[in-house]
């Protein structure tokens, strides 16, 4: 059995399958992007490098690889359709742009090497091990303030009480900041009184209202360029701020609060880093920020923090991932438009290791509608088949898979073959005893294709009881098939009039038979 690209390459000179030559699309093609209405030049003169493809779950099977390596003219994957989401360099501006690429090669040369690298990258994603972040928060709660130190903060607490009803935020920030400075001026150099401990204490005890929390966030930002000189200190403060945000408000958050927190994050980046600060943030704080940005609907920042967690080998909580997927659906309104699906792939590209090894039912349900080719659907189904919760996942998703199979083409014979493939993939999960409720859905789907042979085979093999209600469903499906495929495959084995007559007489009651008479 040929299972590797190396073996495939040995056979390529023996097995040439000449396929109909397809005209290559223009090297440069102007395409409007729905997102901003601008037009860009889409670079589409070659198959993207395997590292440029961001599809998180497509894996060509051994047969797909063999066919590509054995096809002399225009070998392809995914039938050469323009559905492989890729991040490529614009040929002129050299900016990275998101496009749907065709995995269609000019000729057979180099196909095996391309496949070897693509498969190796997919294997690397499968081998990534993720572990949940430690939930120990003791280090965030240990504030190094003695009772003597807290007594020194009485003046600061009084200032907070006095300015509580003041509307001028800037004057309130200056008042608190001045009192902080007075505390440090009065304090002896021997005392271990640190700014981060004071701010964390104030946030924990006085940040119970949105107004006070905004005030303390602004004070923290002012202290960044004086006494807050370590990221360890900022981890403590951010943890307490985000805990209060979670406790005080339900989304949508106050715009002033959102602005204050995002200004603080920008100031932290400017203070400590030329770019972004994720590498120095504690995983728990990163997860808090991820949750916060998901709730505010900021998908770009959500993607950044989610991707950073995964790169650090940390498995985000399932509830956070589900909320992230929901936010994507809300943003795109569950759209199945080509551009929206391409953009969705950009937001879930980092989830590849989670899909492969830690996929949940909700995640799989999110991915099924994104498949634009049957081979993508099979890749996803094979991932589910190998997962630890395979049976539960298939129980919940199989009806969606069956429905999705019929969306790729209108050809009843191709649809019948694809339905059979799906059935053969899932049946071993049930020990060949596929539940009758699923078998009945397959039968109805075969009826929609006018495939009398497969209907009869499944009814007999799985001893399906044909109730009056179910027979009516079959009849409706067959009538739809006759309308949709009136001129196709009428003489094919399993679809012709003889098979129709045999099926009607053997499986339908007298009353139901009349409904299908010509």
Swiss-Prot record:
The keyword Transit peptide applies. Keywords: Mitochondrion, Transit peptide, Translation regulation. It is found in: Mitochondrion. Residues 1-19 form a transit peptide. GO terms for molecular function: translation regulator activity. One of its GO terms (cellular component) is mitochondrion. Required for translation of the mitochondrial OLI1 transcript encoding subunit 9 of mitochondrial ATP synthase. Belongs to the AEP1 family. This is ATPase expression protein 1, mitochondrial. The gene is AEP1.
């Amino acid at each position: 059995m040929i299972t590797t690209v190396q073996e495939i390459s040995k056979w390529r000179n023996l097995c040439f399958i000449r396929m109909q030559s397809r005209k290559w699309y223009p090297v440069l093609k102007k395409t409007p992007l729905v997102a901003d209405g601008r037009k860009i030049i889409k670079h589409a003169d070659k198959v993207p490098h395997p590292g440029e493809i961001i599809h998180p779950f497509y894996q060509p099977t051994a047969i797909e690889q063999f066919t590509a390596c054995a096809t002399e003219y225009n070998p392809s994957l995914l039938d050469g359709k323009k559905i492989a989401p890729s991040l490529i360099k614009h040929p002129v501006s050299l900016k990275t742009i998101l496009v749907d690429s065709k995995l269609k090669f000019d000729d057979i040369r180099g196909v095996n090497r391309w496949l070897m690298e693509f498969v190796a990258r997919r294997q690397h994603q499968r081998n990534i091990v993720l572990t949940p972040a430690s939930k120990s928060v003791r280090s965030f709660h240990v504030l190094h303030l003695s009772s003597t130190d807290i007594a020194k903060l009485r003046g600061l607490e009084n200032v907070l009480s006095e300015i509580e009803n003041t509307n001028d935020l800037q004057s309130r920030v200056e008042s608190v900041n001045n009192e902080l400075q007075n505390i440090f001026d009065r304090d002896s150099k021997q005392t271990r009184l640190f700014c981060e401990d004071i701010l964390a204490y104030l946030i924990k005890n006085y940040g119970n209202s949105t107004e006070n929390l905004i005030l303390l966030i602004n004070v923290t930002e002012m202290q960044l360029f004086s006494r807050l000189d370590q990221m360890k200190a900022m981890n403590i403060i951010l943890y307490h701020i985000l805990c209060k945000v979670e406790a005080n408000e339900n989304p949508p958050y106050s715009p002033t609060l959102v602005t204050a927190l995002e200004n603080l994050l920008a100031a932290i980046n400017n203070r400590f880093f030329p770019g972004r600060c994720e590498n120095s943030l504690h995983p728990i704080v990163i997860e808090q920020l991820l949750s916060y940005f998901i709730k505010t609907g900021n998908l770009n920042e959500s993607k950044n923090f989610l991707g950073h967690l995964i790169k650090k080998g940390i498995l985000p909580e399932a509830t956070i991932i589900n909320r992230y997927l929901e936010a994507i659906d809300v943003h795109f309104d569950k759209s199945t438009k080509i551009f929206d699906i391409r953009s969705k792939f950009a937001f879930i590209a980092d989830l590849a290791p989670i899909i492969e090894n830690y996929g949940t039912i909700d995640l799989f349900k999110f991915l099924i509608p994104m498949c634009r080719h049957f081979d993508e659907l099979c890749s996803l189904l094979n991932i589910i088949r190998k997962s630890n919760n395979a049976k539960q996942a298939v129980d919940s998703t199989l009806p969606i898979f069956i429905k999705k199979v019929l969306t790729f083409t209108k050809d009843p014979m191709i649809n019948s073959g694809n339905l059979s493939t799906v059935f053969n993939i899932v049946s071993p999960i049930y020990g060949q005893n596929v539940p009758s409720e699923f078998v009945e859905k397959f039968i109805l789907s075969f009826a929609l294709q006018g495939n009398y042979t497969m209907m009869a085979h499944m009814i007999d093999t799985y001893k399906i009881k044909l109730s009056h209600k179910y027979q009516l469903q079959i009849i409706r499906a067959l009538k739809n098939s006759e309308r949709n495929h009136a001129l196709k495959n009428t003489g094919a084995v399993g679809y012709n009039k003889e098979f129709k007559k045999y099926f009607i007489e053997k499986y339908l009651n007298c009353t139901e038979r009349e409904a299908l008479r010509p």
